[in-house]
């Protein structure tokens, strides 16, 4: 097996396990640092179209919408200065939570989502297609987003290359991915977390360096790659104390805006936040 980014065959095996598939290993390239699964054979054709990402018993879309509402609002607030009177495409739009907020300001919103039941649910609320190739010829967008999608793609480079076809000359691409340098993995080395966080749907995990490499290989220009911490200190303390998720709910009394900002700023400074947010544009 070769590294997706640099074609090296020199891998180390990361500690931990893939939570839903014990046949897979987590490989880290010793040349460039990309983290990838040892195989992609478990993802069959039609996997995402048939709600395979959600397991054998997908939760109702209404429950899914409630669970993503906080992130949908965060992303809207993060990008709202870019939205007024702009044409927006959200690739892998999921339940459409971000787009439904974005259409308050944008001149038009479009979603790309392979999951059939979601398209049926959203078809009367927003314009939605199953793939980029289904867009009308000549379609152009001022903002293209992909939130926690790139890590699911077997060939993310080709998708980023496709984005270029639909991006307006002065447009922007914003992608958000989980970070392979998450402090729970690389600083605290939480063993329970190492057996919890890796997932068979996440084919790749990027750090700031490997994400920049992917962007450059796709012929795009990096405006910025930002460290962002989604989970607060209470979550991390709970993992370290109890070895379980949910600390941001059970121990929320520990959190305050000042404490969380100070903790997030510290993790950002050392490059070990749990999330990366990249702003991209076309090359000159």
Name these PLM-found stretches.
Residues 1-147, 156-162, 227-228, 243-253, ...:
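Conserved N-terminal segment of class I S-adenosyl-L-methionine
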Residues 153-154, 167-169:
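Helix-to-beta-strand junctions that scaffold the AdoMet/dcAdoMet cofactor pocket
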Residues 175-204, 209-214, 235-242:
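Short, glycine-/aromatic-enriched active-site segment of Class I SAM-dependent methyltransferases
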Residues 86, 170-171:
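Surface-exposed loop/turn positions
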Residues 152-155, 207:
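Acidic/polar helix N-cap motif
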Residues 4-12, 208-227:
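A SAM-dependent methyltransferase catalytic signature shared across enzymes that methylate proteins
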Residues 118, 181-183, 229-232:
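Feature marks short, surface-exposed loop/turn motifs that line or immediately flank catalytic pockets
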Residues 148, 152, 202:
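Histidine-centered divalent metal-coordination motifs
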